[in-house]
Amino acid sequence: MSNIRLIKRRIRVAKNISQVTKAMQMVAASKMKKAQEKAVSGKPYAQKILELVGELTKGREIDPMTYPLLSKNSAKKNLVILISTNKGLCGGLNSTLFRSLNNWIPKEQETDFVTFGEKGRLLILRLGKNLIADFSSSLFLNGVGGLLKLIVDGYTKGEYGQIYLVYNNFL
């Protein structure tokens, strides 16, 4: 008789767990939908900014004194800013990003890395690359000021010839 009670109790516990899981999925789906709407609503602005910068620099002589960030730089070292997640619960998001990065990294040039996201930091350290800054522990917007200073100073002082931003693009 106690076996039947035990089995019924386990069935009830399993149903409760199932209900909690469904509720969590609904909350996650709602949050995901809001995040997707924000990403989609910002896309036209990002596209227009890229077009404007392209038009401003296309076929024109750029005065390095006036626009130092738009002038050519002959430094051989590159800077890669890698934006990844802090946790791994995101399907193939990080693995696809890291595979693409690993295939793309210029092998013949010296490259420094800056990371946003714990998973990106761990990858760069595992690959034995030169990690000069990590903003994983701070909120993204809190780290932007330090990152901008690093980028502008590194480029204007001739430390970096090219600066790349590596991230997942929401389609």
Stretches with model-predicted labels:
Residues 2-171:
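Conserved loop-to-helix interface motifs that mediate assembly, gating, or partner/ligand docking
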